[in-house]
Amino acid sequence: LQNQIEQNAVGHAYLFTGPRGTGKTTVARIFARAVNCERPVNGSPCGECAVCRALSEGSLDILEIDAASNNGVNEMRDLREKVQYPPVSGKYKVYIVDEVHMLTDSAFNALLKTLEEPPAHAIFILATTEPHKIPATILSRCMRLDFKLIPEEDLETHLKRILDGMGKEYEEEAVSA
């Protein structure tokens, strides 16, 4: 994802898959800010430019939809209408659809129409724990990224490295698995 931002070659649809708690939605939010950042640093948002500030304050250029509670065709038709409007402050309007596997068949069909002919300013990030429930017609239009759980030992090592680098004291038991 960082390389795509650095090379200004982002796609229009992504599918983030993996177990709960692996960072799919968090990465989607960071990516949404990074693609709109005026001065990205190594493919990450700078957090300081006007666009980054606007996005962190809740800009309309990043829209999150929880498909678990908004899973009907009307919500996807509403999305199809909204997608025509250009972004307010950034280069892209990013639509994050969390738990996309919860959409109804009719809603998937409405989403498919949007993915088939997306405006140049729109990016869709679909997140799911159950990719096998996504229709093949949707899957074929997305770049898929699989998220995996990080082993506890790796988390412990990384956390210790960060704390040591910051010069922070810690109890061994507090960072152990």
Language-model segment annotations:
Residues 167:
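Alpha-helical interaction elements
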